[in-house]
Amino acid sequence: MVAPDDCSYRPFLPLFLDMSQRLVVIFGGGKVAERKALLFSDYGPVQVVSQSFTPKLLASKDRWELTECDLRVDFKRYLQGAFIAIPATSNSQLNRSIEEEAIRLGVLVNRVEGRGEVVVPSIIRKGQISIAISTEVPGLTRHLRLRLEEELTEDYQGMARLLGRLRPELKELIPGQEDRARAIRSILEDKEVWRLLGHSYEKAYMRARSHACQDERDSLDAGDSPHRLHRRD
């Protein structure tokens, strides 16, 4: 986030959380609740509590738990065990009551109106790459996301896959963390690795691996094939 001139601005800490075992409870069954359920169910368990549900919520109920309840009568018990609560009913006063009770219980709250204590960013996910974007202006957030999506070509996805595969080998070949970081930087700065990614993933991988083994690097530069180098190991 970039801080505006407004002195009341409070910066938020960007985090990537493992939500696979953390429950998100959404109060309300309308379009907003549907949108939230579609997002959060990609990451972990979701429960939607409402008197009624949109057709899409009902049609995809294998992705989340639907609980029919008159929230005006009882909502407090559904906050038990929740990690994040999302008050998304059409009743603003009810939403405030849910939020107040959640805060009292130590449950995080994602508001659907206004800025709460949990802000859901705009997310770009391509392969093993995840980028989260947030600004104070939704239009700017969307603009940034579109620009970044244009820049995030398949080569970057290939590089993420390549480095993920190479990382365990680097730990064995290069004991020192600083030396490993230096090797990764040299891979990222190697134009030949990037060029090969567009033609042959395996050749790009062997070229990248050679940064950890100087003798292999010298042989590649001299014209040895990646296949011969692989047999030499």
Predicted regions and their residues:
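NAD(P)-binding Rossmann-fold cofactor-contacting core
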Residues: R35, Y43-S60
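Rossmann-fold NAD(P)-binding glycine/threonine-rich loop
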Residues: S92-E136, L140
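Short, hydrophobic beta-strand segments that form beta-sheet elements in well-ordered domains
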Residues: I26, P45-S50, V109-R111
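Glycine-rich adenosine-cofactor-binding loop
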Residues: L15-L38, S50, L162-E172, G176
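An accessory alpha-helical subdomain
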Residues: T135-D233
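Glycine-rich, highly charged phosphate/nucleotide-binding loops
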Residues: K61-Q80
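Short beta-strand and adjoining strand-loop segment in the mid-core
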Residues: P45-Q47, A82-S92, Q128-V137, E150
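Glycine/serine-rich phosphate-binding loop and adjoining beta1-alpha1 elements at the start
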Residues: M1-M19
